[in-house]
């Protein structure tokens, strides 16, 4: 099997990480892969904030948990009631992906970059988990203050995040795939 397809098929959402931080060479390679993602009209209106500071990661997770408690979605509230709940699964690295609020198609561009991050990580035997609930970090009156503290450019909005770390668990088995989702017009 082709190596690229093998990596795609092996990648899983990992939710248990070793405490050891990802090496600089590896995180730089992963982030370079993100920048090689396609973007509409090659506009590249994305920004990647790589958070590895343990105190900042704890602060982010705690803020998200508190904001989830105010959610109208019962499942989110139930998870957040657990004081040990960490939306990032205690990963030692989290990438926040943001994009220019005025640019077009950035959700798609950032989605492609997110997949590149996940696939590059898997190719290096590093676990990843794409996490949308990190958006609750910016669901408070302190959103602008948090963005500034994280170095997120003004006028950029949260799109998605990716937790990264050395796997402390084997990849889960492949879940069944719905095969009735493709039609060919020839």
Model regions and ranges:
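Acidic, surface-exposed loops and disordered segments
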Residues: 1-186
């Amino acid at each position: 099997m082709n190596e690229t397809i093998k990596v795609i098929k092996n990648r899983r959402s990992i939710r248990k990480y070793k405490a050891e931080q990802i090496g600089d060479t590896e995180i730089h390679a992963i982030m370079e892969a993100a920048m090689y993602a396609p973007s509409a009209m090659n506009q590249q209106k994305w920004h990647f904030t790589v958070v590895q500071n343990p105190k900042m990661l704890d602060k982010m997770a705690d803020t998200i948990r508190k904001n989830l408690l105010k959610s109208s979605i019962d499942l989110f509230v139930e998870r957040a009631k657990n004081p040990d709940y960490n939306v990032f699964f205690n990963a030692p690295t989290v990438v926040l992906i943001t994009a220019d609020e005025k640019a077009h198609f950035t959700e798609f561009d950032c989605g492609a970059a997110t997949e590149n991050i996940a696939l590059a990580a898997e190719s290096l035997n590093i676990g990843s988990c794409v996490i949308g609930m990190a958006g609750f970090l910016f669901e408070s009156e302190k959103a602008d203050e948090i963005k500034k503290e994280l170095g997120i450019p003004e006028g950029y909005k949260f799109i998605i995040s990716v937790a990264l770390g050395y796997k402390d668990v084997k990849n889960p088995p492949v879940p069944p795939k719905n095969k009735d989702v493709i039609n060919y017009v020839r």
